[in-house]
Amino acid sequence: ARLMSLLMLVFSVAPILAPIAGSLVDETAGWRAIFWSIAGLTMVGIVMVAVTLPETRPPAARAAGGLGAALSGYRILLSDRAFLGLMATGACGAASFHAYLAGSSFALINHYHLTPRQYSLAFAVNAMSFILAAQWTARLGLRFGLRSVVRGAALAYAVTMLSLLLLYLAGIDRVELLIAFLLVGYGFLGLVIPATSVLALDAHGARAGTASALIGTGQFVFGACAIAISGRFTDGTARPMVATIAACAALACALAWLSLRDRTGRQPVAPAANRPV
């Protein structure tokens, strides 16, 4: 869980820095320079991987069997209902964040008339709560069990986002309200995604790479669906985005409780203090 929290920290830095950096590039060199910057950073990444990232697994420990072994691993994972439930829980949570990624600029800039710089700061604040909460996943998991953390955080996230949706449906439409609820909600989401990934991988250590690939693919597929649904109902306000986020949060909560309903007690993923991460 500590390792997953660290990975979430690394992966979450980009959503915080990218809008701020993008607004600065746009203001100084125009929007075309953003794409040139992306291309340049991509080339730097390719060179760094080729030059500075050696293979870490010894030859004897590397997976063998080629395509057949890979397909067999996918078959085993896709037949594991517990794995699928946890993967879908995390994917629904990630989908809610993708809906925010896609719709927040239209809502905060076009609807609430924030400047690009103000939008970048608002986005960073909400993403920061996700990162900070993710760093507590391991500690809370050791104290309460990761299954309890997932159930509680998913429920709190759903309640927070559904409350925000009800306020919008009641006609209360304020940017301060949106930012505040997202700040709290994404804190809970920061507990859900790392914990579900750890629980899903726990029983599949021998095929962790395949399982991780499925988890990542599920998050992006669910995210693309959430973006498409939110975009289909765009009306110039923040309501479609908020409704999509709330729906994803509610679905994640339902899946979490269904997937973990028969599993109680402390989480066995990290029963020993000196378990390697």
Which residues are covered by each model-predicted region?
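Juxtamembrane intracellular "pre-TM" segments in multi-pass secondary transporters
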Residues: 56-87
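Helix-to-loop junctions at the C-terminal end of transmembrane segments
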Residues: 133-147
